[in-house]
Amino acid sequence: VHKIIFLDVDGTLNCSKTWQGPHEDGFATLCPDMCDRLKRIVDETNATVVLSSTWRLFPGKGIDKLRVWLAERDITIHSQTKDLSMEISWGNVRACRGDEIAMWLDDHASEFPPLEREFVILDDDSDMLPSQKPNFVHTSFKDGLTDAHAAKAIRILNDES
């Protein structure tokens, strides 16, 4: 079974405490404890990390900084979701994070077949599709990725009810 983590950054790997103060490049420092929790999820599930955060939209800044921080923990970003925010609009309804994740899963179905995969979404925003709710771990900007969130993600990825 292939296991996938859709990773948001702000509100997952950093929080209101690490966001305080000036940030030279506009990107907050990641919280070491939260990065360690992500590492625990990866280690206990052998999951692949896919970046769904808006950090993916800033090559040379956000994503490069993130890759360095995660590499220090032997975590690699496998891929990233496509930004649909400017591409798809149905009337007044904009594409949401859940749409971007659904498109990634569809686009990568040969590599990660639907019947042979488990996925989890780590995000402090709740704009997921109804079908994704069982796979959604709702973090918060106040606290980021907690031990309880990590445990829930591991249960989802390891298909433990």
Predicted regions span which residues?
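Active-site neighborhood of HAD-like aspartate-dependent phosphohydrolases
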Residues: V1-N46
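Structural motif
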Residues: I4, T48, E118-V120
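Short His-Asn-centered micro-motif
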Residues: L7, S52-F58, L122-D124
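Short, active-site-adjacent cap segments at secondary-structure transitions
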Residues: L13-N14, L57-P59, D127-L129
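Acidic-and-aromatic substrate-binding clefts and catalytic sites of carbohydrate-active enzymes
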Residues: A28-T29, L57-K61, W90
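Substrate-recognition element of Asp-dependent hydrolases with the DxDx(T/V) motif
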Residues: V42-I63
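C-terminal cap/substrate-recognition subdomain and adjoining C-terminal extension
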Residues: I63-S161
